[in-house]
Curated annotation (Swiss-Prot):
Record keyword Repressor present: yes
One cellular component term from this protein's GO annotations in UniProt: 7SK snRNP
Region (Disordered): 1-124, 174-223
UniProt-recorded name of the protein: Protein HEXIM1
Modified residues (Phosphothreonine): T197
Coiled-coil intervals, chain numbering: 244-310
Native source species: Bos taurus (Bovine)
Subunit structure, as described in the record: Homooligomer and heterooligomer with HEXIM2; probably dimeric. Core component of the 7SK RNP complex, at least composed of 7SK RNA, LARP7, MEPCE, HEXIM1 (or HEXIM2) and P-TEFb (composed of CDK9 and CCNT1/cyclin-T1). Interacts with the N-CoR complex through NCOR1. Interacts with ESR1 and NR3C1. May interact with NF-kappa-B through RELA. Interacts with CCNT2; mediates formation of a tripartite complex with KPNA2. Part of the HDP-RNP complex composed of at least HEXIM1, PRKDC, XRCC5, XRCC6, paraspeckle proteins (SFPQ, NONO, PSPC1, RBM14, and MATR3) and NEAT1 non-coding RNA.
Basic residues composition bias: residue spans: 109-124
Localization (cell): Nucleus; Cytoplasm
InterPro entries, alphabetized: HEXIM (IPR024872)
Gene name as annotated: HEXIM1
Chief site of localization: nucleus
Length: 320
């Protein structure tokens, strides 16, 4: 009963569930054709079948006691590891892992996977809004050089190049020289004032020394006035651009009326100023006349005093 079982297993190829056993089996017999059976050495007792006679048995031809080398029966090796692929399992590329096509990660079991570690050199990174003006300027210059280099490389390769977007105009606006509004050296006030100086003159001089009511000097007031004029002109131009034709005509007529009204007011003020100038001339003449009369009165008083002294002199001589 043992011969039919042995003959049935002799013609079946050796199979294995572990890919490592298949690889070792192929390395031992690289030149063996795929259909050929492997001869088992006689001295190896592990490959003898259970039906073969033990030591001391009688030889026979094809029987149980024959000493002829028999081909090895079917041996199935079970892989103890759970990572070995089962029969019919396929990899990522569709390869049959059970037929020896194991991925290199499973073949190299002892090699560890390389893990990239962070650099020991710490990168001093700070948010852009926390940088100072000098640090922002250096950062923008570095980014500008890098962008110029990349744009040059893209232009050399024939790729379309867009203009570099930068914030340098903000730095230029910040670096503009602005007038010093608070650190001016103002002249000191006089320690003593004359008695004939009025309070109004004193307040005017104090306002001029302090640079006006806002506490700024002449440069600061000019800067504010120029800034206001530029802002008003820009706003007025934008408002005119947004107006329609009818609105522009209406605005023009209103401006003409305002101009004529201002001209009439100017003429009236000019006439009043001329009349006031005439009155001032009359007042000036009267003041000169008053000064002349005062001088004459003083002269008459001195002459009268001299006459009185002359009259008293003869009376004193007569009494002696």
């Amino acid at each position: 009963m043992a011969e039919p079982l042995l003959s049935e297993f002799q013609h079946q190829p050796q199979t294995s569930n572990c890919t490592g056993a298949v690889a070792v089996h192929e390395e031992r017999n690289p030149d063996r054709p795929p259909g050929a059976e492997e001869r088992v050495p006689e001295e190896d007792s592990r490959w003898q079948s259970r039906a073969s006679p033990k030591s001391g048995g009688s030889p026979g031809h094809g029987g149980e006691g024959s000493l002829e080398p028999q081909p090895s029966p079917l041996k199935t090796q079970v892989c103890p590891e759970s990572s070995c692929p089962e029969a019919g399992e396929k990899g990522q590329n569709g390869d049959d892992l059970s037929a020896g096509g194991a991925p290199p990660q499973q073949r190299q079991v002892g090699k560890k996977k390389h893990r990239r570690r962070p650099s020991k050199k710490k990168r001093l990174w700070k948010p852009y809004y926390t940088l100072t003006w000098e640090e922002k300027k250096k950062f923008d210059e570095k980014q500008s050089l890098r962008a110029s280099r990349i744009r040059a490389e893209m232009f050399a390769k024939g790729q379309p190049v867009a203009p570099y977007n930068t914030t340098q105009f903000l730095m230029d606006d910040h670096d503009q020289e602005e007038p010093d509004l608070k650190t001016g050296l103002y002249p000191k006030r006089a320690a003593a004032k004359s008695d004939d100086t009025s309070d109004e003159d004193f307040m005017e001089e104090a306002g001029e020394e302090d640079g006006g009511s806002d506490g700024m000097g002449g440069d600061g007031s000019e800067f504010l006035q120029r800034d206001f004029s530029e802002t008003y002109e820009r706003y007025h131009a934008e408002s005119l651009q947004n107006m329609s034709k009818q609105e522009l005509i209406k605005e023009y007529l209103e401006l003409e009326k305002c101009l004529s009204r201002m001209e009439d007011e100017n003429n009236r003020l000019r006439l009043e100023s001329q009349r006031l100038d005439g009155d001032d001339a009359r007042v000036r003449e009267l003041e000169l006349e008053l000064d002349r009369l005062r001088a004459e009165n003083l002269q008459l008083l001195t002459e009268n005093e001299l006459h009185r002294q002359q009259e008293r002199a003869p009376l004193s001589n007569f009494g002696d």
